[in-house]
C-alpha cells in the first residue's frame, strides 16, 4: 500500500510542478486500482502512470452504469425482470467496449493469475488470492437437530456431537475464487477512490480544516514518527475529517439493503416476506432530525460520535453484513490523505468554483470531476 501511495505522490508532484489544475478523481482511481491489485492479487501494474491502461478502462466501463438508466430502473422496479435486465445491461456495456465484455476481460485476467499460482509453486505470495486458493469450505453431510439436546442427557449430547463432526471440507472451486476475487477487485477500487475525491474537494473548499489537519500531521512527524499503518490510526482529527466527508458524501447509496425474512407490520406499513428494503443512506446522512446543520462540513461533530453507534451513519453499512473491507479502506484513505496533505496544499481549480456535479451510479454517488490545483509545501514549514 505504501509503495502505491509513493507512486501517487510522484504523479502529484509532476502535476504541482506544472502549476495547472487537473482532475484528481482519476488519480485516486488509479491509486486504488494499484493498491487492490498488489495487496489482493500480488500483481504489479503500471496503472498509475499509464494513461492507456486497459485494466482501468475496463473497470471504469463497468461502473459507467447509471441508477436512472432505463434498463436498470426496470430491473429494480420489477424483480421478475431483473435477470433479463442485467443481461441486457451487460450487452450494452459490451457494445460500448467494442464487442469486448469488460467483465469477461477482468475475470480472464484473474483466472490467468490463479492458473499460474497453481502450476508454479514459486509464484505463491502472501496475499488474499493465495488465502482463497489455500482455503477450504466446510460442508454438512447431515442435518443436525439442536432440539435433541437436553440438560444432563449425555447420550443425546454424543449423538449431536457425532452429527457435528459428520462434516467434510473441500477446496474453493476456481469459479468461486474468480467470482470472489472479481468482487474484491471492484469493491476495492471504486468506493475508496470516490471517498478520497470527495475529501480532497472538501479540504480544498475549507482551508481552515486543511490547516488543522496539516498541524496534526506535522506534530506527529516532529515526534519522530512516520506516516504509516501504526501511526495514522492515532490521528484523531484525520479520522474526524474522513468520517464527516463520508457523511456529507457517502460513496455508496444502495449498499445497505435487506430482504424481509417474514411478514412485518411496521406501524401502518405492511412489509411482506421477501420484500427488498433499502436504506436511503444519503438522505439519512442529511436528515436534520439526526444531524445538526447537516449541510455544513464540520469534522468536530464526530468528537463525541453521537450518531455513529446507531443506524443513522451508514457509509459502510451496518450489522454482521457490513462492508468486509471497511478497515482496509479506512487505512488506505488515511494514508493517502495524510501523505497528500503533508506534501501539498490542495486548492480548488477554476473549473471547480461551482458545486460538485454528482453522478448517481448503480451503487455509488460519484463526482463527475474534481478539479484542483496543488502547491508543494516548503519542507521547513
Feature locations, PLM:
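Conserved cytochrome P450 K-helix E-x-x-R motif and the immediately C-terminal K′/meander segment
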Residues: 108, 112, 227-267, 288, ...
